[in-house]
Design a protein with these regions (language model features):
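Nucleotide-activated chemistry modules centered on ATP-dependent adenylation/adenylyltransferase
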Residues: 1-160
Length: 160
């Protein structure tokens, strides 16, 4: 097994992760990632797919697209495991109450990316991975600091 740390960008195709990918492509942040990985819910706006097609031409490292299936189809057809999208709730008077639990992020974004990272690192499902094998870059701005959390898997170090 190669002892070099695998470096990946979790590319959400938003401002932060796209900026990180482009800065890395120009050598402004290092090390050069081995891959960028985009988790496709198959329900993204058209401009996201257009952006991904463009940014892919700018990167010296592969952009890999993964999916757990269609979030839209799961919601509309009530698939076996319902992973609700981040819907906002409101009171009867129309005031915002908050977000429903964001289970879809785990099932449609995080899990497919982790599965691909395991594969790229050369590990099978449930196979033990040494601590610190992967560095995953996640684009989060300072106003979203509450989202910055350590990876639950010890084999992955998150970097923002």
């Amino acid at each position: 097994m190669d002892t070099k740390k695998l470096t990946v960008i979790s590319l959400g195709a938003g401002v932060q992760s796209s900026t990180m990918a482009l800065m890395a492509a120009h050598g402004e942040i290092t090390p050069m990632p081995d891959y960028a990985i985009f988790a496709d819910t198959q329900a993204e706006p058209k401009h996201i797919y257009t952006w991904l097609d463009w940014i892919e031409t700018q990167l010296p490292f592969p952009l890999i697209r993964v999916t757990a299936g269609s979030l839209k189809e799961a919601v509309l057809n009530g698939k076996d495991r319902f992973a609700p999208p981040p819907f906002y709730t409101s009171t009867e008077s129309g005031e915002k109450e908050g977000l429903l639990r964001r289970q879809c992020t785990r099932e449609y974004k995080i899990a497919p990316i982790q599965k691909k990272i395991r594969e790229l690192a050369g590990y099978k499902p449930r196979q033990r991975i040494p601590v610190g094998t992967v560095e995953q870059w996640i684009g989060i701005s300072l106003d979203e600091m509450q989202r910055m959390k350590d990876a639950p898997e010890r084999w992955c170090d998150n970097r923002w």
